[in-house]
Amino acid sequence: MIFRALIILSFFSLINCENGKSELPPVVLGYIALDYLILTDPDRSSVYFSTVRSLDLDIAYETDAEPFTGNYIVGGSNIWNVTDSNLQDVFADRGYPVAVTVPTDLSEMNEIPNQNRSTWSVNQLLDLVPRYRKKSSNFQSTSFFIVYVRGQLADAPGVIAVTISGVLGIGPPVIFVFKDMIEQFSNIASPDRVKKAEQMTVTHELGHALGLVNAGIPLYSSHQDKDHGNHCTNSSCGMFWALSETKVETFSPASPLIFGQECRDDIRNYNP
């Protein structure tokens, strides 16, 4: 897909979330600090929810920044079942099937060389796309590219992940996950917590890529947190602007759906 617009740089939510650990900076625990949204081409979401019949994830990871795989210790479910279940739910009840494919093992993902960066500019992140993206998309099938890197976003150290769209030539939105930021959720006493945080983050970013909240999928009810850009006012929703340790700790992979009813209503009532 070719986007015809310039990019708007939107500082939606520079996070200043207290994490309760004196040795860590208070900006660490939060969700997106910025999103890149397209000025025009609103058909981005309308394609995903009309003509697309298959969706998969093309995942790459920098050496030593690999995603968590395997099973959760508590409950034993597959870690990537969280992302898969939420995507399956997104495309359920549309009157036609959409095949969703989510890789669950590192053998299904692409390891890329260590980039030796402690900070990343947006352009440096985008340089990875033509080098390592393996799959293309069309109006029948969509492949979202997710890249795990070490380091942090320059001038925004609290960013856990970022979704970039609207850039000529990159295709569908690209998600970058900063593994160093994810690891701030690590806890020896609760080894599943960092894995849950990573999956909640990936699912949140995919929500943005698909068009939530009011970023392509129109609002069915008034629930956009305009102070934080395209995020939901429902603090229990996976599209809320911040992710706290408590929220991650209480999340159960046995009940993997993280989008609140407001966001799910947006999707269910969107028929482009």
Model-assigned labels for residue ranges:
Residues 183-264:
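The catalytic-center signature of Zn2+-dependent metalloproteases
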Residues 48-49, 133-217:
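Active-site-proximal segment of zinc-dependent metalloprotease catalytic domains
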Residues 13-16:
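C-terminal motif of bacterial Sec signal peptides marking the signal peptidase cleavage site
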Residues 24-144, 148-155:
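Propeptide-to-catalytic entry region of secreted or membrane-anchored zinc metalloproteases
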